[in-house]
Swiss-Prot record:
InterPro entries noted in UniProt: UPF0210
HAMAP family: UPF0210
Annotated family: Belongs to the UPF0210 family.
Name of the protein in question: UPF0210 protein Ldb1026
Signal peptide: none
PANTHER family: UPF0210 PROTEIN MJ1665 (PTHR37560:SF1), UPF0210 PROTEIN SPR0218 (PTHR37560)
Subunit structure: Homodimer.
Classification via Pfam families: DUF711
Length: 447
């Protein structure tokens, strides 16, 4: 590799906020199932603290050796609804507390997998887990929860959609920030390294390391050099930049998995913003030529960005997976925050944008008096986009008590802050209360 390319990468790290967003170890807990929940929890704690004992140490060694910042070290586990169902317990909070203790013991930032997969229907463990979510998130600091309510092959479980709206409101009453650790999915993936939606799928190996890259600032800087050029040039520039960013993820992921003695899973090609200036997906879209994100043309610009990132990234690594697209969280992106404050970026526009990117209505703060049925309807809309387009979509929405449009909420850290966004006042309750299942689309019949 020539010196110029090496210096380009050094400059990306020093001046353009390039980092690896996460190294995430996925751990199967299927061999921890036990009819005695205390024994099961002890097995879970022992396995996590053994397998992930050196995860943080190795990540820090690689940061020092390669000079590449690794923002987060995380763990995902098998969905707990599958593990805890054998116990017959009436709630699964103790499993969440065990995950939290294990995460703290090994020093990771977050642990995901307090999850249930109910896209076609409930099993007993799913019902118990979902009812346990509010208390589990109340009693833990690092645990993340997710529920998959639909898929292209199965349709949408509207009973689960209704219940998740109610769970979001229950979380709001305890602590609205807890909803930042809860994601409701359609077409959830098994190898997602990002939080709060990560879990370790049953088709994965016993232990695997997945990597999530970042780098919106790098893409924006590259586009500043092609002002006024055609969209062909813009797309090519994004592809070349994504290649460099992903190559770094592949290098670190392979080396980390080798040192940890685990399988190397995937690199997730998602562009993940932070609230820091110069680390914004919205600013990339504005660099392409929009006066503000949220105006007409936003969806087209985002579609091209997302596709070009995938095309560049696929060439750079052996296994691509996870969510692999541009994230558009309202609270974690300085450009999104600015556009929302001005009223240019709306929930409706964000919904349109999710049709062409990862992942969905993410970290959206809404008025505290928003009804549970309205939250459920937002979930249903997102799930429908995912189901019809055969892609992953999700909702992470945060109703804030006592707040209304014009106010804002401070989350702190990577979550940033969010202006309260208006939602439609017209009720969707009669539709949500029907329950049942929305059938899978006709083009899902592939066999």
């Amino acid at each position: 590799m020539d010196l110029r390319r090496i210096m380009e990468t050094v400059n990306m790290i020093d001046n353009e906020n390039l980092d690896l967003r996460t190294t995430t170890m996925g751990i199967s807990l299927l061999d921890c199932i036990d009819s005695d929940s205390d024994r099961a929890c002890q097995k879970i704690y022992d396995k996590i603290t053994t397998k992930a004992e050196n995860l943080v140490k190795v990540a820090r060694e690689l940061e020092t050796e390669y000079g590449i910042p690794i923002a987060n070290k995380r763990i995902t586990v098998t969905p707990i609804s599958l593990i805890a169902a054998a116990s017959g317990d009436s709630d699964y909070v103790k499993y969440a507390v065990t995950l939290d203790k294990a995460a703290k013991a090994v020093g990771v930032d977050l642990i995901g997998g307090f999850s249930a997969l109910v896209h076609k229907g409930y099993q007993n463990g799913d019902r118990v887990l979902i009812k346990s979510i509010p208390q589990a998130l109340k009693e833990t600091e690092r645990v993340c929860s997710s529920v998959n309510v639909g898929s292209t092959r199965s349709g949408i479980n509207m009973d689960a959609v209704k219940e998740m709206g109610q769970i979001v409101i229950e979380n709001e009453k305890i602590n609205p920030l807890n909803n930042g650790n809860l994601v409701i999915f359609c077409n959830a993936v098994e190898d997602n390294p990002f939080m709060a939606g990560g879990f370790h799928g049953v088709g994965e190996s016993d232990v695997a390391l997945n990597v999530g890259v970042s780098g919106p600032g790098v893409v924006k800087t590259a586009l500043e050099k092609v002002k006024g050029e055609s969209m062909d040039v813009v797309a090519e520039t994004i592809k070349q930049t994504a290649f460099k960013v992903t190559r770094m993820g592949q290098l670190v992921g392979q080396e980390a998995s080798k040192r940890l003695g685990v399988d190397f899973g995937i690199v997730d090609l998602s562009l993940a913003p932070t609230p820091a200036q110069g680390d914004s997906v919205a600013n990339i879209l504005e660099e392409i030529g929009l006066e503000s994100v949220g105006t007409h043309g936003t969806t087209a610009a985002l579609a091209m960005l997302n596709d070009a990132v995938k095309k560049g990234g696929i060439m750079a690594c052996s296994h691509v997976g996870g969510l692999s697209g541009a994230f558009i969280p309202e609270s974690e992106d300085a450009g999104m925050i600015a556009a929302a404050e001005k009223g240019i970026l709306t929930v409706d526009k964000l919904e349109a944008m999710t049709a062409v990117c990862s992942v969905g209505l993410d970290m959206i703060a809404v008025p505290g008096d928003t009804p549970a049925e309205t939250i459920s309807a937002m979930i249903a809309d997102e799930a429908a986009i995912g189901m019809i387009n055969n892609k992953t979509t999700a909702v992470r929405v945060i109703p804030v008590p006592g707040k209304e449009v014009g106010d804002s909420i401070e989350f702190g850290g990577l979550f940033g802050y969010a202006p309260i966004m208006p939602v439609h006042k017209e009720s969707s309750a009669a539709m949500i209360n029907r329950g049942g299942r929305i059938p899978a689309p006709v083009h899902s019949f592939k066999n």
